[in-house]
Amino acid sequence: MENLKYPIGSFNWDQDFSLEELLGAVVRIQDMPNKLAKLLNTEKRDAMLKAQYREGSWTAQEVIHHMADSHMQAFIRCKHILAKTADTVQPYDENAWSQTGDYDFSYESSYLMLMGLHQRWSLLLLNALKGDPSVLAASLYHPEHGRSISLAQFIALYAWHGDHHLAHIQLCLNSANNLN
């Protein structure tokens, strides 16, 4: 069951990241919508969007909506770090957000949001990585995690988060392919 919940493993909070690793993470953030597009380009798309990756999980469609919600939050958190306009993350309840009714609608609006957001977000992060390296240590306190999270950790976390949910969507596609 843990392999279905964390198909690529859980995020390692204790890892230190080199500039090269962070550049690679930004490329993964930039490319995530393209990888999602490849998964959506299937004859089994409708079945995949309704499939769950494990019992009781979100469907692929709900995962796409969640990624849009979560990655908008992450973009804003990165902006707060870079603009020095906040010192604490504004938490949000992802499960409550998934119950607001919009997760029932087609994935397409969230997909389009992810396309634009990831383009802008990756440019923001690449620009930050070109500047003063001390910005990577700048952080926000995250009350849900009980710790401060640096910009470097946010970059790595959300590269992981995108890969994590792409793996969930791949599991949904595998499930849809096994229906026949």
Task: Tell me what each language-model feature is.
Residues F11-R28:
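Short, charged, low-complexity loops and linkers
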Residues G24, R28-D31, E62, H66, ...:
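Alpha-helical initiation/capping and key positions within long helical/coiled-coil segments
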Residues V27-N41, W97-A137, Q153:
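Acidic/histidine-rich alpha-helical segments that form the ligand environment
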Residues L22, I29, P33, G56-S57, ...:
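Generic structural signal for well-ordered secondary structure
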Residues M1-I8, N12-D14, A47-N95, L126, ...:
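Short, contiguous alpha-helical
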